[in-house]
Amino acid sequence: MFKTICVDHVGIACKDLDLSKKFYTEVLGLSCTGEEAVPEQGVKTVFIPCGETLLELLVDITENGDGPIGKYIAKNGQGIQHIAVRVDDVQAAIDTTIEKGAAMIDKAPRGGAGGMDIAFVHPKSVGILLE
């Protein structure tokens, strides 16, 4: 069994990372805590603490703009792309999710930003992409 700890972050797909960072820092007065490319996912991320959770700005870094974030923006426009909850055991969360009948995109944890193990629940199961 696993324990859900908190909402970890809200992933926001954006076309222009610098413009988005400027809004969150200069307009909302927040600070960026880290910027990281995750080439295996074709994305660059920036985390921005906001109270008890994080905002994660996501921009496509693939050559043709056809990574997951580029495809998301092409289909849906910019905006909330996923919500992430922190759990104490990612594999147990995957196993329980499958056991309860929800569809997983990932059947095993994979590497994410900040060295975290991540996995995604298919949005058809829960109404939004859930990490």
Where are these predicted regions, by residue range?
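Vicinal oxygen chelate
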Residues: 1-3, 46-49, 56, 85, ...
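Helix-adjacent hinge/juxtasegments
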Residues: 56-81
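N-terminal beta-strand motif that seeds the catalytic metal site of vicinal oxygen chelate
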Residues: 1-18, 78-87
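Short glycine/proline-centered loop/turn elements that form peptide/ligand docking sites
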Residues: 19, 37-41
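Short secondary-structure junctions
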Residues: 29-37, 101-108
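Short loop/beta submotifs within extracellular cysteine-rich repeat domains
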Residues: 20-22, 31, 53-57, 65-67, ...
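Conserved active-site tyrosine of GNAT-family acetyltransferases
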Residues: 20-25, 97
